UniProtKB/Swiss-Prot annotation:
It holds the Pfam family HbpS-like. InterPro entries: PduO/GlcC-like, PduO/GlcC-like_sf, YBR137W-like. Coiled coil: none annotated. Belongs to the UPF0303 family. The lineage of its organism: Bacteria, Pseudomonadati, Pseudomonadota, Gammaproteobacteria, Enterobacterales. It comes from the Bacteria. This is UPF0303 protein NT01EI_1570.
Length: 157
């Protein structure tokens, strides 16, 4: 699969993985599912779900540090600004041989295009938040989030 095909697949994934309803109970259930799956995969991650500027779920698993929460903040900023997954944005920038700082003038202290933050989309509403993890390699972070969301929504990928 070419990089362009991979980007198209990521865009389709982002459009497919949308919620019809999202509230604090949904965030709790999804966050717990992410934590359980991270444990099953042997990953030590911090998990964060933010909706409309409010943190609805946050969990730092054993083996993580405050740096993971900082990575989440920076990756989440990318999702909220571009309404794309941080992994897709990183891949797009790599294809263009540029960075968030060079292309958009964004401070790397506040924005990170490494994988692990995914748009929280509600059908007919758009991006209303972000579901983020940090602690594993960026592809593993991305796959943890996207695969758990898909399972949570009953969507086969």
């Amino acid at each position: 699969m070419s990089s362009e095909e991979a980007l198209a697949r990521l865009a389709a994934e982002e459009q497919q993985l949308q919620f019809t309803l999202f509230n604090p109970d949904t965030a709790w259930q999804l966050g717990c599912a992410l934590r359980q799956e991270a444990g099953r995969r042997g990953l030590h991650v911090t998990i964060d779900i933010q909706f409309a500027g409010q943190t609805l779920f946050h969990c730092a698993m054993p083996g993580t540090s405050p740096d993971n929460a900082e990575w989440i903040r920076r990756k989440r900023n990318v999702v909220l600004r571009f309404q794309r997954s941080s992994y897709a944005m990183g891949m797009r920038l790599t294809l263009r041989n540029t960075t968030l700082e060079a292309f958009y003038g964004l401070d790397p202290a506040d924005y990170a295009s490494q994988g692990g933050s995914f748009p929280l989309r509600i059908v007919n509403c758009g991006c209303v938040g972000a579901i983020s993890v940090s602690g594993a390699p960026q592809l593993d972070d991305h796959l943890l989030v996207s695969e758990v969301i898909a399972r949570f929504l009953g969507i086969n990928q």
